[in-house]
């Protein structure tokens, strides 16, 4: 089945799995999804993820969700820039999420990174999603 927004699909799978208190969720693999998961893992929102390849050439990513005392670490995860409406921000206009308690993930010319990294490297880009 063709998905028009692969990153949005992955975020929705994570949101649904967190709502059902699942420990793992799987999604088709792509480079962008893996880079976003790298940021989520580095920031402590997921435990880990593993990528596996099937005989037919398709790959899948299995994500281990993180809970603290039974409460999901990810409270809210939303897509900002969508295929029909792209959202680009300069380094000066990168928004803070929940007064700095959450993060935004950006796709920049220097790679996919969290908002605080983009500010440090003085680079803007496409605002992919917000996590709190």
From Swiss-Prot:
Pfam families: Ribosomal_S8. GO terms for molecular function: rRNA binding; structural constituent of ribosome. Keywords: Ribonucleoprotein, Ribosomal protein, RNA-binding, rRNA-binding. InterPro entries: Ribosomal_uS8, Ribosomal_uS8_CS, Ribosomal_uS8_sf. It comes from the Bacteria. GO terms for biological process: translation. GO terms for cellular component: ribonucleoprotein complex; ribosome. Belongs to the universal ribosomal protein uS8 family. One of the primary rRNA binding proteins, it binds directly to 16S rRNA central domain where it helps coordinate assembly of the platform of the 30S subunit. NCBIfam families: PRK00136.1. Part of the 30S ribosomal subunit. Contacts proteins S5 and S12. This is Small ribosomal subunit protein uS8. It comes from Brucella abortus (strain 2308).
């Amino acid at each position: 089945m063709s998905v028009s927004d692969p990153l949005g699909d992955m975020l929705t799978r994570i949101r649904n799995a967190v709502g059902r208190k699942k420990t793992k969720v799987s999604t088709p693999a792509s480079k962008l999804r893996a880079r976003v998961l790298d940021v989520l893992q580095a920031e402590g929102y997921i435990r880990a993820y593993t990528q596996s390849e099937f005989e037919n050439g398709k790959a899948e990513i299995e994500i281990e969700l993180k809970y603290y005392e039974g409460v999901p670490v990810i409270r809210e995860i939303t897509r900002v820039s969508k295929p029909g409406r792209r959202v680009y921000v300069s380094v000066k206009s990168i928004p803070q999420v929940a007064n700095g308690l959450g993060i935004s993930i950006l796709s920049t010319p220097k790679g996919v990174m969290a908002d605080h990294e983009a500010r440090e490297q003085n680079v803007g880009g496409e605002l992919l999603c917000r996590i709190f």
